[in-house]
Amino acid sequence: MGSKEKWWVELPGLDDRPWLLKLARLDDRDGTVSGEDWAEWTVHHLAGLIGIPTATIRPAVLEGRRAIVSQSVLHDRFEYLDHGNSVLSAKFPDYDQSTDGENPGYTPAAVREALAEVAPPVESDWPTDFTAFDVWAGYLTMDAWVAGRDRHDQNWAVVLRGDERRLAPSFDHGNALGFQERDERRQRMLDDDAHLRRWVERGANRYFGGQPGLVDLAWSALGLASSGPRDFWLDRLDTITDDAVHSVISAVPRSIMSDVTHRFVVRLLAMNRRRLLDGYSGS
């Protein structure tokens, strides 16, 4: 799916699960690497700070081109992936799977109904009473934090194994953290907090009905989740330390993520975290 160059590969010395190798796309404007590779790796590790299960990501190089490899979320040949559009269509026969853009039927409420008989992922440390939707609401909370705009209905899935159905770990997070911006614009936003705030407030998901802002979308999902899980995700977000965030971002080499980009991502995460916490407590 998608237009990115990618192939399934095996990595010797690791387990038998395949890895999806995805080349970082080049910017049409000047041929520079767009940054999806560092964004996907960074989001994978940020997700771990709040307990979101994700596909394992490793940096890679193919014939001199930057890339990442993403480990399959399927554990063996007895498991299959049923993507969100199929899950929603099974619950709602009139659901339009062909829409490439805003889908009025794609809402948190519809997803909650579609996941009613689905178990949460096995990769977890959350309380045992979490439902699959409670975890999925956590995915949207993470999206809002990292400015992830690509949670379309094929960008989440259910793992099928015999009669068992479980929500898959989150995957495909390259469209996040302002990866597409140039350093010149990042610096302007760092110099002008109001400019940066306008930028983050424009962040929206164009696939859900109504094309909601990312923070509003997260609030909507959290509002439909059980109270315990809702508090769990917000508490996890609230307890993240600046040192933990810096540790993740500092691990990206400066040859890949410039100092300006590093500071921009740190500031972006701090602002979105505050918007989520302050906005929800005041709603």
Predicted regions and their residues:
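Conserved ATP-binding subdomain of kinase catalytic cores across diverse folds
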Residues: 1-99
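Non-catalytic, well-ordered alpha-helical scaffold segments
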Residues: 41, 64-67, 134, 139, ...
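Short alpha-helical "patches" and their helix-cap loops
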Residues: 57-64, 152-161, 282-283
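C-terminal catalytic region of ATP-dependent kinase domains
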Residues: 35, 161-283
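ATP-dependent phospho-/nucleotidyl transfer catalytic cores
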Residues: 73-140, 250-251, 255
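Short, surface-exposed helix-loop/turn micro-motifs enriched in polar/charged residues
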Residues: 35, 58, 128, 148-150, ...
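Conserved kinase catalytic-core segment
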Residues: 108-182
